[in-house]
From Swiss-Prot:
Protein family membership: Belongs to the anelloviridae capsid protein family.
Swiss-Prot/TrEMBL keywords: Capsid protein, Coiled coil, T=1 icosahedral capsid protein, Virion
Species for this entry: Torque teno tamarin virus (isolate So-TTV2)
Protein name: Capsid protein
Subcellular location: Virion
GO cellular component, one term: T=1 icosahedral viral capsid
Listed InterPro entries: TTvirus_Unk
Amino acid sequence: MAYGRRYWRRRRWRRRGGRWWRRRRPWKTRWRRRRRRWRRRRYGRRARRFRRRHRVGRWRKLFRRVKSRVVRQWDPNVTRRCMINGYDHALFWGQQAQHRILYDNLPWPIKKEGTQEGGSMNMMQLTLQFLYKDNLAGRNRWTRSNWDMDLAKYHETTLLFPRHRNYSYVVFITRGPNDILDEHTYPGLHPEKMLGRRKKIVVWSKDLRPHGKNYIRVRVPPPQVFKNQWYFQRDICQMPILTLGFAAFDPVNVTLAGNMANSSIILWGIPYWSRPMPYNTWYDYWTKCAGPQNIPWSDRQTNIAAGITQKSAQTCLKLKNKHFGLTNTAIVSDYDKDNIDKNTKQIKTIVMSLNRWYPKWPMKWKDAGDINTQTPFPYRYSWREDQGWGNKVRLWTRECRTDIPEETLGIENMPLYVLMNGYIDYVTNHSTHSPLNWVVSVFCPYTDPPMTNVIPVGKDWFIQNVEPGENKYPSDNADNTFAPGEKTKIKNYDSSKDEFTGNVIRAPDVYDSLPAQQALYIASPFSLKWAQTTGSIVFFYQSKWTWGGDFPRQRPIIDPCNRPKWGGLPVTGYDETGLLLQNPEKAEARARGHLGDLRRGDLTKTALKRLMELTSTEEGSPQKKKRRDKEVRTTADLLRPEDVYCWMSPTPETPPKAGKTPESSFAETYDNHTKLAKRVKKEIHNQNRRHRLLLAHLRRERDRLLGHHLLR
């Protein structure tokens, strides 16, 4: 039946689902044009003329429909869905340990009484091996066992963050495969940096938000590198499925703590080297340029020694601006040779000079007979003045060197309180450098005075590590306490020490910079102040997995009278529900065949290559004899005895040795080559035996898989 140009009449039924880019309607109906409702004309008014306007749709470019790709994937014979439900410690910190980093993925050593533990910041990676260790510790429960299941498929993880009564914290979640922990990671865990992230989760405390839910639930899909396919458990057991970062913060006391008058703090430090301290001794500079305006101590009026004359200001200015060169390999003046360890080449008793450690440090006194230990240099710092650009924090070696000290793990161009956040914790827990052989060097132009290669220490560092010498300051002896000319004695006096200096017991190390890290954290924005002494925060998770394996569904029937009795202690892998768990890191399943390895009754090339790469140490591989070390053999060693004389080049005749005839020499040579031939034959036989074992293993796997396929 022809309709002429009205070609649209030929299709009486509409296209299934309408246009391909539209969603199909869930109901079945015919397309009818809705009639316009006409209102009844009122009397006394002129009828309004209505003109129907046909609606014209917007012009759209027609795209070709992209066909979906068909992915054909083999599934194992047996699959088991497993839900891993558990909890873990997000944050916990002891008294005055807010500035520390909680390393949850590291084994915790047993702490002594009074030692700081934990931290208010943490970063952890969830892996399949991490979930298995949590099960051994009793922190999660597996609904299905992975015993005899060599394959795994990851689906998702649901996280639940409960609200704490007193503390608020911020969380970030990443699914990238390149989330590595280095020296640049932990400065980003500072609360100010965490709150400035684009993607974050802020969990407010119940004191600030009394209403609302008591938890925040987050669903985390698989990482970008994970495909919806089966993996061997051993291959993905160490691959992070997600990375979590936690940081507790104080939204009430943002800038100042309860006992702080302003945002400025005092940092104490020792210069690693200083131009006013020449390469030979500090005493050299003292004698050449003395005076309160030239001595770099905080309390200059109390550092004037008797008997030292004041030099001109021009001489002092030249001495300050002089560029002192590096020392040679010889021992510096006023150094004791016994002060340097011959094995480690480190100086035992030290205080700094230019690229050298100087064992003597000036003391100061207030009155006759009263000696106070000199404090380190004070540096005033405020986070409001710190712009970040130009700051540097790095590790320097403590070795006695004649060149520029070795430098490593340097980070820069961030505020000082961000650079020092977690830096010492990273060095002591993650780096390969010993904290006792390195020092933390800080370069910050925003302090007063600027810190130029300064080692931050505590204020009482010299009190703990300096043994004072003898005070020779003249006394007026107003109360006739001392006899005329008598020297003032102090505690622990040693006549071998200098008369107006103290002897330093040891050098500073990485641990001595912890007071500076704590002071910077407490004075920084959004940090936990002194009022919050201890705290603990946990989170809950539910991870969804699927285990896969290839054992027959229909198990053979066994005589019950021949079944062995179960006795003895339970296996370690059992949990409280009786499930037998297997360590995914040690589950080597490459020696096992699967139904996906068969193609028309034979093994595929991929499966054959995987089985050929097995070694005798892997679980499930065919056992074979230990391989002997290959010996370097020449062509003559591989020849038969009867072919030796045909191949060997003629040699000059030599007289036979005493007691040996040509016939006996020939017999000895023949016996040696016969032994070589037997050894070569035995080696070839062993090699063929290994091939036969491998082929027999392949045939057994093929027959087993064919049998499982028929049982299905």
